[in-house]
Design a protein with these regions (language model features):
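Residue-level recognition of well-ordered beta-strand positions that form the cores
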Residues: 64, 174, 189, 214, ...
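Short, surface-exposed secondary-structure edge patches
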Residues: 50-54, 226, 265
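Thr-Gly-centered strand-to-loop micro-motif
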Residues: 44-45, 101-102, 149, 200-202, ...
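Pseudouridine synthases involved in rRNA/tRNA modification
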Residues: 1-35, 80, 195, 204-210, ...
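Short beta-strand micro-motifs in enzyme catalytic cores
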Residues: 90, 171, 223-225, 271
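RNA pseudouridine synthases
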Residues: 1-185, 189-194, 287, 292-302
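Short flexible coil/turn linkers enriched for glycine and charged/polar residues
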Residues: 86, 140-141, 167, 207, ...
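Short alpha-helix capping/helix-loop boundary micro-motifs
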Residues: 45-50, 221-224, 259
Length: 305
């Protein structure tokens, strides 16, 4: 068990306590917050509040949390869309909705579970038992190319390329709004949001983050972009585009909370991956097509023009 202390902001006044806790405590769902309240694990200025308590402002909250149990990664027979594979690396086209590795709340059904079944013992151990072979990640509701290493030498080589930006990742997305320029760069540091611990944000003192973008097509109220990452921060493209006023279509975290009909996630797809092969040093360049949902949305937009 461990305890955290929280002081609500002025903007939190009137918010239900369970909702506030789910926003401010990383990994805590609203239902889990409600259970903590019911079990007396939350105090407000030293007293246990009622389950319907709303933030008044200025109070001090104390939350006692049980230690999270890390799920064990086990092989699972989950179909994989393998784009490239050899004795050193495997590149997969990850579908929307698939989490990369097991974590509290997502104990199985992840890419790691699928890779363990597909590759057997042939995965790098550098990522540890929970993340074998994983060199980089993409969000659950982002689709596209992700690379995993089959041995430690390959993992170290790819991680070095990721650090010096020679492992290039290209994305396509549909962003809300119209861009005046044809291309640009967002250079803004990213860190954990101070108002919602589940979100990232552009914050002073955050980690350096650079995203390059270019316009592929313009539609009424929506722009089709290609984005290239110079760094790889959590939710980077989503945060940067929201920061400049153009959140990704379907992103209910950093954009409009109302889901977009026809989309099960944000319209963001990792279309391209370029790296030097860890064994031969030869360049490898891979692409994968946009998913059906993305294509259907493009077709709808094209019909409006």
């Amino acid at each position: 068990m461990h305890t955290i202390r929280l002081t609500p902001l002025e903007e939190d006044t009137g918010t239900r306590l369970d909702s506030f806790l789910s926003r401010r405590v990383e990994g805590l769902t609203r239902s889990a917050a409600a259970r903590l309240l019911a079990e007396g694990c939350v105090t407000c200025d030293g007293a246990v509040p009622g389950k319907s308590y709303r933030i008044a402002g200025g109070e001090e909250l104390c939350v006692t949390l049980p230690e999270a149990e890390e799920p064990e990664a086990v092989p699972q027979d989950i179909p994989l869309d393998v784009v490239y594979e050899d004795e050193d690396v495997i590149v997969v086209n990850k579908p929307v909705g698939m989490v990369v590795h097991p974590a509290p709340g997502h104990p199985d059904g992840t890419l790691v579970n699928a890779l363990l079944h597909h590759c057997g013992d042939s995965l790098s151990g550098i990522g540890g038992e929970k993340r074998p072979g994983i060199v980089h990640r993409i969000d659950r509701d982002t689709s596209g190319l992700i690379i995993a290493a089959k041995n430690d030498a390959a993992h170290l080589a790819l991680a070095a390329q990721l650090a010096d930006h020679t492992l290039a990742r290209t994305y396509e997305c549909l962003a809300v709004g119209n861009f005046r320029q044809d291309s640009g760069t967002v250079d803004a540091p990213i860190g954990r949001s101070r108002s919602d611990r589940k979100k990232m944000a552009v914050v002073a003192g955050g980690r350096p983050a650079i995203t390059h973008w270019e316009v592929l097509a313009r539609y009424p109220g929506v722009t089709h972009l290609r984005c290239r990452l110079e760094t790889g921060r959590t939710h980077q493209i989503r945060v940067h585009l929201a920061y400049i006023g153009h959140p990704i279509l379907g992103d209910t975290v950093y954009g409009n909370r109302k889901p977009v009909p026809g989309l099960t996630g944000q319209c963001l797809h990792a279309t391209g991956l370029r790296f030097l092969h860890p064994r031969t040093g030869c360049p490898v360049e891979l692409t994968c097509p946009r998913p059906e949902e993305f294509e259907r949305m493009l077709t709808k937009l094209q019909k409006r023009t």
